[in-house]
Structure formats: C-alpha cells, structure tokens
Amino acid sequence: MGDIYTGIDLGTNSIKIVVTEKVNDKYYVLASISSPSNGIKNGFIEDSKAASSSIKKALRQASDRLGVKITKVIACVPPSNCKMDIVLGSTSVIDYNGITGEDVSNALLDSLKGQDFTNDELVTAMPISFTIDDSNVTKDPKGMKGSLLETRVVISTMEKGALYRILETLKLSGVETVDIAFTSTGDYFAIKNKKYDELVGAIINIGEQSTNISIFNKGIQIKNGTLPVGSVNVDKDITYVFKAKPSEAREMKENFAMALANYADSNDKWEITIDKDTKKEVHQLGVSKIVEARVREILKLAKNEIKNLTNREIRYIIITGGLSELAGFNYLVEQEFGFVAKVCDITNMGIRHNKYSSCYGITKYFDDKLALRDKHYKMISDDDRESMLVIDSNVTKETMFNKVFGHFDGNN
C-alpha cells in the first residue's frame, strides 16, 4: 500500500477535495469531489457557519466514495497579499557518516529563528539550496557527508487572522489540518517536472471572482499578483447581453460557448428562459463573441501583471482554473501569449479537469516536503486503510486505486 493524502481547496463557487495514493513514485486518485460552496470568497472565509456546512457536505461525499471517514486534510490557502523573503539557516550535522532528514529539518528550523511572525503566519518554507561545509551545493543533501549544513530558504507568510479563520472553519467541519500551502504551490506541483524546475515561469489560475498570477524560479514561488476579475465576469456578461438567468449563463459558458468565436457554429442554437412566458434562442456564435471578449481581456491583464511582477525572461506560462476548460481555450491562449504558454493538462483518471489542479498538486507538495525531511505521515489509520480493500480471490491488485475504481463518476 502507498501513502494516502487528502487535499482540500475552498473556492468561491465550489469546494474541491482530492484523495491521492502514491505508489512507486506515481500518484493515483482514489476520490475527487467538487461540491457547491457558501460563505467563502476568493478562498477566504466570510461566513464560517455557512462555509462549515458546505465543507461538511463535501467531506461526506468524499468519505462515501473513499469508503472511510476523512479526518485529516492538507489545505490550500489563497496567496493574495502573501509576503515572501529569503532567509538563511544552518546546523551542525548530527552524524558525520551522513546527513539525515533530521539535519535538514534542523537547518530549516534555524532559518526561521529571529523572523517576525507578529502579524503574519508562516505558510511554506521552500529551500533553494543546501551547502555542505561551505563547498558542496545541492538541493537534497541527505546521505552526503559533512559537519556543517547551511541552507537558503524562501519563506512565505499570510495574515494571521485570515489564515486562522480558515483553520478554525475546517476544525469546525470536523477535520484536522495537518499542513497548508498556497493554491499556487498546488498548481505548480500539479505540473511540476525537471524542465520547469530549472526555469523561470508563470502560472495563471483563473478563479471564480479573481485571477491569480504566480512567478516561479526553479520551482519556487517568488512573486504573486491577484486581479479582481474571474470566471463569474463571463457569466455576468452573458446574463447582461442575453437577459439570461445566472445559472443558464454559466451553463451556456461551460457547455455551449467557444472561447474563440472563429470556431463557433452560427447555426448552433441554445434556448434560454427570459421569464415564465418567454423563451429565446441564442446562437453559439453570438455567445462565443461575448465569452471571447471577456476571456481575452483576462489574459491580457494577466500578461501585463506578469510584466509588472518580474523583468526576468519567462520561459513557460501555464493557465489553469475551471475557465481554462472552455472549448477552444488553448487557441486563444496561443494568440495572446504565443507558444511559450499552454493550458494545464491534468490527465490523471478521476480529476481530468483543471479545477482540481490546486488540491491535487498540494498532495504532491506535501509528499515532497516529507521526503526531503525523510519523514512519513499517516492521514488514514491502518484499520481504515484495511477497510478500503476489496478482497478479490481471483485478481491480485497492487494499489487502492484499482480497488476503489468503482467510486468514480462524472468527474472525468
């Protein structure tokens, strides 16, 4: 059996939960949920009671699919107004025969000494590099020999009050938060590879009411910007122009419109309800023109924000978020950014939708964090893990992924 992790992303429109199992360095999705949310705006808690009720409902659905109750989560938190700084830490190596995960942890803890956390709380501490005895530089020093281990670390923080409201609401919902990371961190780990780990790039996540732009240097976030525009603005445009209900506007956007109007069919029609006595047909071309105009504006604003955040050469741009699933979205991205940009492509069975990028990636981040420190953490008890197994005397199954395959439904 592999290590099992649960990630949760509290969005304005929906709560996403993804449960993964790591087996032989591969991550398999055991359960995924996208459930309507209330009391949450841009990842922040506005009404803890309403938010808790929504979270409980999502947790019940995820637990039902998993077959055991979820009691521990890794939580995505919004990077809006986050602060980042580079700090230094060091430690004497415990055993000269080889650096251990404990030495790594001690060096990272030392880097936090003397930092002012009066108003802000630590979210992540991402090591840039480790130096052994002032000479050897590496990203993972475990097993190497030396007497002094030093590290350069990017620490990120967010305002305490906002973070504590998120943690308190999750606790009220019946789960323990074992770790936190920014949604942008989850997005990066969802697409992380050796190539991106050596480059400077940007990730654009188009959310419900805001768009987040994150700059990464060799796999570590160094800058962040947030725009007050998102997917809901597309809905509002459709509602205004065609006098459609908000729910119908969203449905047209997701299931009818093209992101690039050139690919729309002028003969394809969609019937909307104006009032109880009046219905109206709208053409795909007309709806797509409205959608394209707003999405193009969001992409242009994001491009300008990238320039404002850094003057470094951007070697890759990844666009994610639910809006990036629009038909033809990749063609619009190519027009605005060129070949340096592409749409996030999550191919894992069970989460083939970009709305899951943050909470899927955060489980990979947590596992990576543990591996560097040579630690393990059980989010599900041994008894619960055993209860998840489906006994089949005729077929040998290597992972829980196979055993809970039947829990998947319309999330693919």
Indicate where each model-derived feature is located.
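Glycine-rich phosphate-binding loops at beta-strand->alpha-helix junctions
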Residues: 78, 158, 258-260, 314-333
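ATP-binding/phosphotransfer module of carbohydrate and carboxylate kinases, centering on a glycine-rich
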Residues: 303-317, 326-342, 372
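Glycine-rich phosphate-binding/hydrolytic loop that grips phosphoryl groups
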Residues: 345-389
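Acidic, glycine-rich loop-and-beta core segments that form the ion-binding/anion-interacting portion
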Residues: 194-261, 265
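Phosphate/pyrophosphate-binding loops at sites that engage ATP/ADP/AMP, CoA/4′-phosphopantetheine
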Residues: 58-71, 299, 303-316
